[in-house]
Design a protein with these regions (language model features):
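Active-site/binding-pocket entry motifs
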Residues: 16, 65-66, 109, 175
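Beta-strand segments within the central parallel beta-sheet cores of soluble alpha/beta enzyme folds
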Residues: 1, 55-63, 98-105, 131-137, ...
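Short helix-capping segments at alpha-helix termini
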Residues: 53, 93-96, 123-129
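Condensing-enzyme catalytic core mediating Claisen C-C bond formation in acyl metabolism
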Residues: 20-93, 101-102, 169
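Glycine/charged-rich beta-loop-alpha catalytic/anionic-binding loops adjacent to active sites
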Residues: 19-27, 67, 128-138, 189
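A glycine- and small-aliphatic-rich helix-loop capping segment at beta-alpha/alpha-beta transitions
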Residues: 8-19, 77-81, 116-128, 210-212
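Conserved beta-strand-centric core segments of catalytic alpha/beta enzyme folds
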Residues: 1-48, 146-212
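Short glycine/threonine-rich loop-to-helix capping motif typified by GTGT followed
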Residues: 70-82, 108-125, 142-149
Length: 212
């Protein structure tokens, strides 16, 4: 949760946006804008949910976490930790990179994180090979709630057959080779979506959600 101490700490780290605008992966990004929020995902065994006639919005196909421990705040160069985490999640889901049709990125709007994640996504899936979105342009980083919020966004994207745009971003930094969704929602044929959350201290998490 946001509080004065947290804001002061992030401010001293120069992690907060001086413009007050969260614009993930944008060439003009200058830091994040603290957010608050919550999301609840109800998880149930497939057979049990089917038996009781539940309305299924998505299926968890796989997940993984690791700890690069490169630096207490900075990501590992080239997104090495993120690369390993996404590949572990793919292996857990028994999927190949070509099976992923959307990346719900961690995308905090900080110069270092976004550059590292873009490099990692390009390495794992290929340059510009898969649509990328960060919902933090709307929510900002909600700290402990970020993963649940973004997983919920991924489920809703599948349910509505629309990839939301990355708010406030007009296009990716020219140094990045990613297909960033901007401007308007993009229709798509829902399929496996990887949702990333990469935190301080090099701890990384990736989950893969698919249509039910």
């Amino acid at each position: 949760a946001s509080n004065v101490t947290a804001l002061a700490g992030f401010g001293n780290m120069t992690a907060l946006s001086s413009s007050g605008i969260s614009r993930p992966f944008d060439a003009e990004r200058d830091g994040f804008v603290m957010g608050e929020g919550a999301a609840v995902l109800i998880l149930e065994e497939w057979e049990h949910a089917r038996a009781r006639g539940a309305r299924l919005l998505g299926e968890i196909l796989g997940s993984a976490s690791n700890a690069a421990a490169h630096h207490v705040t900075a990501p590992s160069p080239g997104g090495v930790g993120a690369i390993g985490c996404m590949r572990l999640a793919l292996a857990h889901a028994c999927l190949s990179p070509a099976d992923i049709v959307q990346v719900n990125a961690h995308g905090t709007s900080t110069p270092l994180n976004d550059a590292a994640e873009a490099a990692a996504v390009s390495e794992v899936f290929g340059p510009g090979a898969v649509p990328v979105v960060s919902t933090k342009g709307v929510t900002g980083p909600a700290l402990g709630a970020a993963g649940a919020l973004e997983a919920a966004a991924g489920v809703l994207s599948i349910a509505n057959a629309l990839i939301p745009p990355t708010a406030n971003s007009t296009g990716p930094d020219p140094e990045m080779s990613i297909d960033l969704v901007t401007g308007a929602a993009r229709p798509w044929v829902p399929g496996p979506t990887i949702s990333n959350n990469f935190g301080f201290g090099g701890h990384n998490g990736s989950g893969i959600i698919g249509p039910a």
